[in-house]
Regions:
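Hydrophobic alpha-helical transmembrane segments of membrane proteins
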Residues: 1-31, 39-177
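Glycine-rich nucleotide cofactor-binding loops and adjacent beta-alpha elements
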Residues: 36
Length: 177
């Protein structure tokens, strides 16, 4: 299961989605003050999260269901809870990366007016994300343990992301020169 953190990272459409948001929406609207009010920022974040999850969810559903079928076909497991945890943890990984890309976009807004990445902090965060996912491929632990930890982490990350966006994005979500 830890391998799939890297796979879910690799298939996530977060970078393209946030770049499209910037070029088609935020580039023009960030000049207006109403667009930076905390309630508005959080509302837009939730709407956009729903939309990016619609993009990232189908592959996660296929992978999660496919893993369950493969587990069953290969002899299964003694604990039927493993099937549920396997499926839900794949969906949570997809949710995590959707939330992560949007959160980093809102908190660091990495794009310049011409849609080029100008934030060194953004590049650092994305590099750390890559290396953590890569490192997870070396982790060896039972599916149930890793899956439950993954699900709990994803839920906590979502809550923390909403709080951070509400508090900080109105100040950090701006046009770069």
């Amino acid at each position: 299961l830890p391998y799939f953190a890297f796979i879910m990272y690799a298939i996530n459409r977060g970078t393209g989605f946030t770049r499209a948001l910037f070029m088609n929406c935020d580039h023009s609207l960030l000049t207006y003050s109403f667009y930076k009010k905390p309630d508005m920022v959080l509302k837009l974040f939730r709407i956009r999260l729903r939309e990016i999850m619609k993009i990232n969810l189908p592959p996660a559903l296929v992978i999660g269901a496919g893993l369950g079928v493969l587990l069953y076909a290969s002899g299964g497991t003694d604990n039927p809870l493993n099937y549920v945890v396997l499926f839900v943890s794949i969906l949570c990984m997809s949710m995590f990366f959707s939330v992560h890309y949007l959160t980093v976009y809102y908190l660091l807004q990495p794009y310049s007016v011409d849609a080029q990445v100008k934030s060194g902090t953004y590049q650092l965060v994305m590099s750390v994300t890559y290396f953590v996912c890569f490192y997870l491929m070396r982790v060896r632990m039972p599916t149930l343990v890793f899956g439950v930890m993954c699900i709990a982490f994803c839920v906590l990350y979502f809550i923390a992301a909403c709080i951070l966006i509400y508090r900080f994005a109105p100040k950090t979500f701006r046009l770069r020169g």
